[in-house]
């Protein structure tokens, strides 16, 4: 499985997880530039939630959350600002969903990163 398919599979898992938690998926893979992509845009109650998804096969080389660098977070924030400039949104936050697939599937939801 190539990296794009692997990433999409992780995002599919994250969407199913969010939906089970009562989130409505609004958009996926919203691109604003080469460096600025929002993986999942969802709504939970009255809050729009921008979700960065990180998926790893194992945690042998570190946990998925470690891949959310300062630069990555800055790019996510830029994407959020673009989205907010196009849409009327009162309440929002940025979350991360970190998925490790082996030895068993583990999903960690980090809110307000």
Residue ranges of model-derived segments:
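Acidic-basic catalytic patches of nuclease active cores, encompassing PD-(D/E)XK
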Residues: 1-28
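Catalytic cores of nucleic-acid endonucleases
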Residues: 55-103
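Conserved catalytic cores of phosphodiester-cleaving nucleases, focusing on short active-site segments
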Residues: 38-59, 76
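A short beta-turn/loop motif at secondary-structure boundaries
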Residues: 31-34
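Structural signature of beta-strand start/N-cap positions in the alpha/beta core
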Residues: 21-24, 36, 47
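Short, low-complexity, polybasic intrinsically disordered segments
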Residues: 101-113
